Amino acid sequence: MHTFLLAFLAAALYGTGLVTTHFGLRYLPALAGARVSIPSAALLFWGLSPIFMDWAHWQGEAVMLFALVGSFYPAAVTLLTFVGNRRLGPTVAGTIGSTTPLFAVLGAALFLGEVPGIRESVATAVIVVGTMALSKPAGCPVPGTERSALWMPWSAALLRALAQVLSKAALALWTSPFAAAMIGYSISTVIVWTAGFLTERSVPSFNRRGVAWFALTGVLNGAAVLAMFYALTSGPVTIVAPVVATYPLFTLSLSALLIRHERMTARIVGGVILTVAGVIMLVAR
């Protein structure tokens, strides 16, 4: 149950972070926002490191794996998601992103020996279908001129799954979720700022409201990653990945309360029912 609670906490934080991102994008473009959110989490981790960081049992191979994960998660995944959203729309990108648990479960089976049982496999499939229903409104075809961009959300989904599998392997070597998050976000900070310098011809204009919203987003996402890493230390990827993927439930609920543009349709109700049913199947013993 400890693993489920941590995974649910990660899902809730991820879902909330998507809502705060919505507000932040009113004041800053996506890449500028990423250059605020990711470093904000990194700075928070470094600030707390004297309290929570224990270098006594550090393991070099684990540090290298943490850094490898940080080279693409969250930095590259964030950039792929932002560009994919811009070219394909959040609906298509979000729907493809919902397939992450399938790749994570497959990767865990191939590389970690975590072969899921029939119940876990069915529950994962039900959760994926449910989150797809929550992410994909009816009638949203991909423009023909933008179909070449479909590789972006697919790549983001694969990289998210790979991050979970590699992090699980690294945490088996050094059981320090805090180190995993701090090292990963530090590497991602360098990458996202480098990407900004290479792609932007002028210095980005930051304003206080945008910075505040994206700093909050960074803290929420960083806490979500930390909770997910703690869940991975106590449970298998085949359980953690599908539960973390339920974050659209929290995004939908908060959007209905704060943004108030989401209508309850049969599709959404069905998606909620499927997602909750899949989680119950995972929790049931």
Locations of regions flagged by a protein language model:
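Alpha-helical transmembrane segments of compact multi-pass small-molecule transporters, enriched
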Residues: 40-45, 96-110, 125-126, 187-191, ...
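Hydrophobic/small/kink-forming positions within alpha-helical transmembrane segments
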Residues: 15, 19, 46, 71-75, ...
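Alpha-helical transmembrane segments of multi-pass integral membrane proteins
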Residues: 151-164, 184
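Juxtamembrane helix-start motifs in multi-pass secondary transporters
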Residues: 30-34, 93, 180-181, 240, ...
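Loop-to-transmembrane alpha-helix entry segments
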Residues: 57-60, 97, 108, 113-137, ...
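Hydrophobic alpha-helical transmembrane segments in multi-pass integral membrane proteins
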Residues: 45-55, 104-120, 159-175, 220-237, ...
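Membrane-interface interhelical linkers
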Residues: 1-32, 36-68, 78-88, 136-154, ...
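Conserved glycine-rich helix-kink/hinge and helix-boundary motifs of the Major Facilitator Superfamily
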Residues: 35, 91-94, 98, 182, ...
